[in-house]
Swiss-Prot record:
The keyword RNA-binding does not apply. The keyword Lyase does not apply. This is Ribosome association toxin RatA. Keywords: Toxin-antitoxin system. One of its GO terms (molecular function) is ubiquinone binding. Toxic component of a type II toxin-antitoxin (TA) system. Binds to 50S ribosomal subunits, preventing them from associating with 30S subunits to form 70S ribosomes. Its antitoxin is unknown. Gene3D superfamilies: 3.30.530.20. Belongs to the ribosome association toxin RatA family. GO terms for biological process: cellular respiration.
Amino acid sequence: MKQVSRSALVSFSAEQMFHLVNDVARYPEFLPGCSGSCVLEQSEAHMVASVDVSKAGISKTFTTSNQLTPGVSIAMSLVDGPFKTLRGGWFFTPLDEAACKVELRLEFEFSSKMIELAFGKIFNELTSNMVNAFTRRAKQVYGE
């Protein structure tokens, strides 16, 4: 199973970063490779959402069930998509009132070797850039 772990120290609160990452409906506005998104279910502690990823003529949609702990974490597990397994999440560790560590940790395995060959590089690229994309988005939304 492949693993991705990316993190950044940002000058925004854990609460602010949680809200940006949890705003799935806005992903296509700023997340490279994201061509669409849809929130299917939502409550204060839970969300089911789909994200469409497109690049180089290849498009895939995956759906996750997300357990929400506001300002602390978003734990994700696969509902549907091109994966045999996808789990992990976002973690927000306060450093002080106006700074935090943002971390994305994922474990995944594609449903077939063919899908991995077609989509693996695109998914790796997307996940590698996600923390940076959210950091840039925070600067746009909350200011430098």
